[in-house]
Amino acid sequence: MKLFSTVAETLVENQTSLNKADEYNQDHGYHMVDIFQMITGAVKEAPKNDLASGLATASKLLTEKPSGSAEMYSKGLAQAAEYFQGQDLDINSIMPLIQTMLGGGEATVSKGAGGLLDSLVGSLGGEDGLDLGDILSAGASFMQSKQEGDSNLEAAIDAVISSSKMGETPHRAQSSKLVADVLLQTLMSNLGQ
């Protein structure tokens, strides 16, 4: 699927800056490239029109990687695979894909009707449910993004990232923003929007 290979290509281009952002061991960019190359391969090998199968395979492959980011993506992909059982990826399901992938297995998404706000609030709940700290953190992130000129969708993505496991460290927040932006841009351009 072109969607994930485009993310992998973008991560290759940004590998050095992601490594520099990783204050712990300076290898986050390397791991992110590896993670998305594995996801790309697994999704390509999946039966045609079976995104869930590809995501589940990628999740299993990532469990073998000795990386905190791989562990988080593995959990998120497993959750995404469950969500996408019998469902295709389209403009209406991009937010749940981003939420589950970047949620580290803790995103709360449900199938069915609901807008962006429902998706955002659902993703903030995590395993322990939504609390005031989650709302304030997401709201502050949303407001900051809007002040920086981001669209509502970009600001919502920033809010999701800031309140997720991926937002707990600067290097993971940086790579998550890249991943989410590329997923959105690629899907929008593929749909002609």
Language model features with spans:
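Amphipathic alpha-helical interaction segments
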Residues: 1-193
